[in-house]
C-alpha cells in the first residue's frame, strides 16, 4: 500500500517520500545544521515548501509576490532527479488551438465548414517543427518538442461525435517543451505562419489561447 509508509532497513518507503518529502527534509536539516554550527551568513536562507508543482504552480507564483522573495538572489530546488545535480531545466508552454467551422450532415458536407481537414494540416506542419528544432538541442536537455496532447473533433462544446455528422469546431492542445536555446516567441512565430497558410486555404476562423508558459532556465556550469 503506497499510501501507508513503512520504515525498512533505515529507509522510509511510501508515496511521495523521494519526490519530494526527502528534498524538503534535507533542506530543513541543512538549515538546522547551519544554525547549530553558528556559521555567520551574509544573508538569509528561506525554506519554501510550495504546492502544485505538477499543475499551475500556484504555490511558487504566490510566493514570488511576497516580501519573503523580494531580495532572493538564488535558489536550490531539491527535486531528486535520480541524484544528479541539474543546471538546466526545460521551459514549457501549453497552447489551445480552436478551429471554428460549422456542422452539417454527412450527406451535405458542402453546406458546412469541416474543421477536421485544417486540423490535420496543423498537426502535419507541427510535426515538421520537431525536426527543425533539432538545431536548438541542449547539451543536457536534448531537443525541444511540440506534442499534441488533446485532439478533439468535434470539440467538447461541439457535442457528441456521430458517424453521419460533420464536425464544426475542433480543438487541439499542445505541450511545447523549450530549451534555453529557444523561447516561446520563436515557437509562436512558427505557429502564426502555419495558421496564416491554413487560413489562406480553408478560410476558417482559428483562435489561439496561451494557457500557461514558463521560460527555460540555465545556470552557468561554474
Question: Which stretches of residues belong to each language-model region?
Answer:
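Acidic/His- and Gly-rich active-site-bordering loop/insert found
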Residues: 1-15, 36-41
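Conserved Rossmann-like nucleotide-binding pocket used by diverse enzymes
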Residues: 13, 76, 147
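Acidic/histidine-rich catalytic neighborhood of metal-dependent amide-processing enzymes
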Residues: 20-90, 94
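Conserved hydrophobic/aromatic pocket- or pore-lining residues that grip, position, or stack substrates
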Residues: 5, 47, 174
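Short, conserved micro-motifs enriched in small and acidic residues
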Residues: 13-25, 40, 110-116
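Short secondary-structure boundary/capping segments
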Residues: 3-5, 37-39, 66, 86-88, ...
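Metal-dependent amide/peptide-bond hydrolase catalytic core
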Residues: 80, 87, 94-222
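Short beta->alpha junction loops/turns
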Residues: 17, 52-53, 112, 180
Amino acid at each position: 500500500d503506497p499510501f501507508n509508509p513503512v520504515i525498512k532497513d533505515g529507509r522510509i518507503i511510501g508515496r511521495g517520500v523521494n519526490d519530494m518529502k526527502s528534498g524538503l527534509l534535507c533542506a530543513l536539516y541543512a538549515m538546522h545544521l547551519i544554525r547549530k554550527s553558528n556559521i555567520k551568513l551574509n544573508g538569509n536562507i528561506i525554506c519554501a515548501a510550495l504546492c502544485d508543482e505538477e499543475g499551475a504552480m500556484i504555490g511558487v507564483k504566490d510566493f514570488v509576490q511576497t516580501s519573503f522573495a523580494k531580495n532572493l538572489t538564488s535558489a536550490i530546488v531539491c527535486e531528486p532527479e535520480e541524484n544528479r545535480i541539474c543546471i538546466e531545466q526545460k521551459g514549457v508552454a501549453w497552447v489551445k488551438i480552436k478551429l471554428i467551422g460549422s456542422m452539417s450532415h454527412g450527406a451535405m458536407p458542402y453546406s458546412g465548414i469541416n474543421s477536421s481537414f485544417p486540423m490535420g494540416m496543423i498537426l502535419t506542419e507541427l510535426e515538421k517543427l520537431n525536426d527543425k528544432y533539432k538545431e536548438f538541442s541542449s547539451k543536457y536537455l536534448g531537443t525541444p518538442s511540440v506534442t499534441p496532447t488533446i485532439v478533439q473533433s468535434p470539440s467538447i462544446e461541439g457535442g457528441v461525435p456521430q458517424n453521419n455528422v460533420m464536425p464544426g469546431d475542433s480543438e487541439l492542445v499542445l505541450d511545447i517543451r523549450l530549451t534555453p536555446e529557444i523561447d516561446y516567441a520563436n515557437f509562436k512565430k512558427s505557429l502564426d505562419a502555419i495558421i496564416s497558410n491554413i487560413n489562406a486555404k480553408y478560410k476558417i476562423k482559428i483562435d489561439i489561447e496561451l494557457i500557461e508558459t514558463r521560460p527555460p532556465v540555465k545556470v552557468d556550469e561554474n
